[in-house]
Amino acid sequence: MSGFKCYLQLGDRLSQIWLNKYTLVLLLAMLKLLFFSKSIQHAIEVSETYILSNCYSIDSLYSKMTDNTPHYLGIMGNYLIEKGMEETVKATLETLSLIVYASEGLVNFAIDLYLGTYACLIVSAVDGTVDVATNITEKLISLVNDTVSSVANELDTGLNDISKIINKVIKAASKVENFFTGDDDDSNMTSSIKSVNLTISALHNLYIPSSINDKLEELSAKTPDFAQVKNTTKNLISVPFNEVRKNIKAVNASNIIGDTSVLYVPPVSLDNSTGICSSNQSEILAFYSILGHVLKIATVVCITVLICFAVGAMAPVAWNEIKLWRRLCGMRDHYMLSRQDSYTSFSSENTHELKDPFRDPPIQNGQYDVIASYQQCFQTWNTRIAGWMTNLVTFGKSPENIDPKTKQKIEWVVAYMTSERALCVLGIGLLGILVCICQFVMIALLKHKISHSLTSNDGDGVQNLLKSSTAVDIENQMSLWSVQTNKYINTTETNINQEVFGWINTTTLSVNNTVATMISDIDTTLADVFNGTLLYNPMKTVVGCAIENKLYTIEKAMTWIHDKAQLHIPRINGTQIKQALAKQTDNSTIPTASSTSAATENLLENLVNDMREGLLKILRAYHRITLGELTVALVILAVWLVQLPIALVILRLRLRKATFD
């Protein structure tokens, strides 16, 4: 037993190379691949079972999709046709109204162009003549009245002077006559002429009355102007056109398109004759059989490759162990040869006691081993675990009562079971067991939740949830479709108005600007030439009749074209479409609707039951997989426990060999 050590020798190390980390990883990968293959195989089987057990539901849904699609397409198509025809009639009536309005404008323009010009000139001539006569009369009356009054005043002044002279002459003659006759009787002829008073007071009352101007103004007021004549003519012409527009507005577009009930709507089919699943059941079975065969072959090939790599990984590990052991042995031999030169200065005078550099307590020379010190220094946890297990085995016994050889055997067996590779196996096994326990807890919680959540009562709630979810999804999709369609219509309408009618808008604006400039230039020219003269108003009237009225009419027509040259496309109303679908459903026969509802109820109930059963089946499958993983973890733990009999066998063989030696 002198050569027996408490640590593992090269042979002991090589006996555990199959527990190296590379081989373990590859073996675990192989097991993971195997479990993954089983999981896929189970999923394929569940899928096959689900499809075969729900063939009726699949056939029913497919039949509804294929057989009932014409029904809903018919409803949608009829609605679009109805709205399209109605909007077409409305657009036609609007176009007809615009044509009538344009025709009225053209007639008015033609009348204004030919007859209106002459009527305007005639009326303007009368108005101008009256205005000129009125102005001349006013000036003549003012001149005559002012002149006669002035002349009368001057004549009165002159006659007063003459009257004074004559009165003086008469007075002197009277005095001479009295002197010669001496007669104071005033009864004679001369006495009768006391004085002379010459006046023209009648001329002060001579004037031309202003009633003549009033007569002319009354004549001017009674003379109709061109605007009145034009409005009267326009009102007379607009009577038939207004009647036509009134009749057009009174037309009801809904009555013109006819009775929409004659539009055919394909009925809802309740016959699940289109059996896409039932008719192809043999092909479905063959397909799943091929999938299982391919999966099995792929699994076998991958596992074989991983096993080969796992076995091949032992060779480099064994070679590394041999090289490490050689280095340790070389270090030990080198230490044994140089220990006296290295540690003589630290020994006593009578002995050559050596000190272990890796331990604090003093030991005997024969007890020190470099390899043991190396393991204690660089494999700390392995050494500690080995010490704990040794103390556990020798529990209750003092170190002095244990035979040193027995202690070495125990330490060697513990070292064999707590080697780096053996502890790796132990850790993997314990970790696998812990993970499996966690998986069992999770599966139990999920199974409890499913069993108590998807009961019959809650199943109705799930069905209602599915119904409401389906209805909300359909409504959202319909709203999204209408919004996107309206966006497309908006873009198309904008492009048409810009690309097709854009040049019309540009042209009308340009023409209106040109007309406004021409009218402004004409008015400026007339003001520069005739302003302040009697000819300004007549010339302005003549130019207005001949030119400006036509320009104003053109400007008004261009503005009308600019406002009306716009395309308005009707928009999609999702609410009306939904109401049309609901109305069509209400108008359907009651047995058909109730049968469809009952079939839908059955489908939803089957869906809930299949959901519950499918979830439980998946949990059962994962329970089986977890059991397999737990078995693998226990096997790995058993592999570590197998190290004990292997260590005992090796120890037995080594002791027998030492006995023979």
Swiss-Prot record:
InterPro entries cross-referenced by the UniProt entry: PRM1 (IPR026777)
Top-level lineage group: Eukaryota
Transmembrane spans: 17-37, 106-126, 297-317, 425-445, 630-650
Topology of this chain in the membrane: Multi-pass membrane protein
Extracellular side: 1-16, 127-296, 446-629
UniProtKB keywords: Cell membrane, Conjugation, Glycoprotein, Membrane, Transmembrane, Transmembrane helix
Protein name as it appears in the record: Plasma membrane fusion protein PRM1
Organism: Saccharomyces cerevisiae (strain ATCC 204508 / S288c)
